[in-house]
């Protein structure tokens, strides 16, 4: 089925869905007055009654109107914000498992309180995923005030919390956090050595804020927990960084920016061999050098400082391409990060081995119910449905959108583009109109900043180097004469309100005074009641002046690879029916045109003077064509990632379920004895041929347990060598093994035996799984070559992956038994490696 046909089918029922959502809003409106005269205590009692009714069998759907009316009243009392009807509709859509498309400024944060409260009544917890730690903390504090009136506890998961704090936060009715924190906790829980070490309590209902950013943009990025691997940092990284500098693009190697790959040419190979003093780079003994060479060229050509990463305090730190934020603790894998460190001349840190991994796609599929919100989902509706079984519904705006979206202005080269952009910003600044400028990298944001400073335009810069000021900068971005230069503003997740954001400004002011709603809620509420009205009044007065100046002007400096990201940037302006404008300033040398439509760009460049702006349908078509190519390519990649990861996901589910049973079950003696029987059976079957080689059989058996019966005793028991059958051998050896097991148990005591069994099996599972992850990654890297032999790589990956998994399970059985009989019985109460020590978290960008 084509994507366009699927989109038409998905949109066909939207009218019926909206009608149903409107009816729900009308029902809530009809009963909301019942709660206006209640005291806070009475409201809490009503909320508790709803919980009891649900536990007694009443469905959440039937109590939805009452629950939503209570939340609306609680919000009005604490925040001074009453949910609009469209917000009630959005909340109902989330409860029903939809992705609610709600434009920027429609109050998505407040919308989430409705389904969060309703679904928390089950007692199984609700997770709300935000785009960063700051918003997780801020939303949990502000929305937590609403939940508190209703008798609920609110938690938040932050990067610097210890395990006991995290466990406490997960026990709350509603827990806020980022996708990374939730995902890494899931992985760490499945590396725990006792139930007490685990922090999560299941996956019931999750609400994803900026759902497209999480499930689409970051879908290809797996969460990886790594530990240090053996071996020292190789001098080859430094050596090859120098070699890469000596090579020339186009002459010694090719670069494909679209596919993010490099290929070394014959002249380049000859140069490398000469520089290394070797005769053949591709001899088997030199195979490891090829990886060093490829990574050093990638680091040189495909990974740019202040775009893909920054160097802070002598450390290479990855910049999130979607949000512009630093991904603290993340590293590229397979030697690429070390190659970049060598290129930059900073300390080269050791490579790490994967201990646990999961993609965001498969992590969020663990939840019984999933929903999400975003300003731009309809363009990806077919992918949401096919991948996650999530329908999309577009919620109407509370007020009509009156923003003016001006045609793109295109220049021949980048320098002229930025000069004209800066002149335009100065005009807006002079008349008091606030401006938001979206750039694609730290480097570009700093270049624009220099041009504005030359023109005397006061401004703020928001990029990966100063993200700590983010809340204040965004809160003031809609004020009179405010100019804000931001990298990838699309993912910032905070409203830009004309005149300033009174809620955020109030929170910043109270925090500056040392007030914390979680530590002293009563004092905080009193201070809020005093500070908020003043700031609200001041910002509204200033908003009137901003409206007269034309509202917020949004300027894009490049078209993104996805139309959705462009729309998100535009959507920062014109919230809640406010006036506003948007315009993109482009050049024919921008990355999008250069990579994906170079022919059209070259043809136009040849006909246009340097200082002339282009506004033509041809340019628009070329841009749309380039974006369509990239969107199609990225969607296919995500689809492919999921197909391959589904193989590993089934294996991961089996291992983690098995591991969890061991943690929770306590006594695994029967399981261990089954391991012993299976291992013995496999060994005997491998030797059961026409002529028995008992010496070889006994040698193999002794690797798993101390054999107590001799070959002579076995022969005598059978009544002669000719009467020995496989069944007889099996019976005698199993009897002997059972005796050895009982002897081992009597030597160390039953309690120590149970403890030893549990720790040995967990240790072997973890080590074998770690090795299996490495082998599966190695298999996936080379599986594409099977297509040359007319074989489907995915089918081959599934088949060989299954065989490797079965082999791993066999190793787990044999090694567990071997260790059980041979390891020192004095078992430490601590695990060999504490899974709760902060891991190294990787960004696998599939390069």
From Swiss-Prot:
Designated name of the protein: Protein translocase subunit SecA
Pfam families: P-loop_SecA, SecA_DEAD, SecA_PP_bind, SecA_SW
Top-level taxonomy: Bacteria, Bacillati, Actinomycetota, Actinomycetes, Micrococcales
Family: Belongs to the SecA family.
GO CC annotations on file: cell envelope Sec protein transport complex; cytosol; plasma membrane
A Gene Ontology BP annotation from the UniProt entry: intracellular protein transmembrane transport
Residues that bind ATP: 87, 105-109, 495
Complexes and interactors: Monomer and homodimer. Part of the essential Sec protein translocation apparatus which comprises SecA, SecYEG and auxiliary proteins SecDF. Other proteins may also be involved.
Nucleus is among the record's keywords: no
Classification via CDD domains: DEXDc_SecA (cd17928), SF2_C_secA (cd18803)
Example GO molecular function: protein-exporting ATPase activity
Predominant cellular place of this UniProt entry's protein: membrane
